[in-house]
Design a protein with these regions (language model features):
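Alpha-helical assembly-interface signal, strongest on the long, hydrophobic N-terminal helix that forms
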Residues: 2-106
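Short, conserved structural patches
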Residues: 2-14, 75-202
Length: 202
């Protein structure tokens, strides 16, 4: 019968040292292994990055659309300012005049805004500092369509406030809460022009 010599059996300290060295070697290989790191890091930052990028683009489009609407209102209001629009539509049904003026605004608007969604409000005021039009948004964040959308035919030498409003969709309001001003999450974009009409012949 043969017996294994105890000299061939590693001692406990030697075994622990061997295992520790193997563990350190494996840990070193793990640290040096860079495969898949980029994909993991990109996956961690991709969602917030693209959300922020989209929010920036959406804010820029909103500002651009607002400027486009302002330009359209300014260009169309010149015809009211000179009295040409009133004279050209003297025989037009009063219920259709607002639509006619909206068509004038749409001549200066690119495809950013759907023209048939634009609401028009034209009011005459007794004085500039003494009066101002009612806000088009109610206290609970609704578009006040009941009081917005009237057309008061401006005469000569009258103070006129022309407003156009359209709802613009907002998709990333969580990143920019101030982007939305309506309860449904959309933003009411407005274009305004205030002036005194010329003393045109009536």
């Amino acid at each position: 019968m043969m017996f294994r010599s105890e000299a061939n059996i590693p001692s406990v300290p030697r075994l622990a040292s061997t295992l520790s060295a193997a563990t350190r070697a494996a840990a070193g290989r793990f640290r040096r292994d860079q495969s898949g790191v980029t994909a993991i890091e990109f996956g961690a930052v991709a969602a917030p990055f693209f959300a922020l990028l989209f929010a920036i683009i959406e804010t820029a489009l909103t500002l651009w659309t607002t400027q486009v609407l302002e330009t359209g209102v300014g260009n169309a209001s010149r015809r009211i300012y000179t009295g040409q629009f009133q004279q050209d539509n003297a025989a037009t049904d009063p219920t259709l005049i607002a639509g006619k003026f909206r068509d004038e605004i749409c001549k200066s608007i690119v495809a950013l805004i759907t023209c048939d969604k634009i609401q028009i409000d034209v009011r005459t005021l007794a004085s500039f500092p003494g009066q101002k039009p009612q806000k088009p948004i109610t206290a609970d964040g609704q578009f006040d369509s009941a009081n917005f959308g009237k057309y008061e035919p401006p005469g000569a030498n009258q103070i006129v406030v022309v407003r156009a409003a359209v709802e613009y969709p907002v998709f990333v309001s969580l990143l920019n809460p101030n982007q939305s001003n309506l309860q449904n999450g959309n933003r009411l974009i407005m274009g305004t022009a205030a002036f005194r009409t010329e003393p045109f012949a009536q």
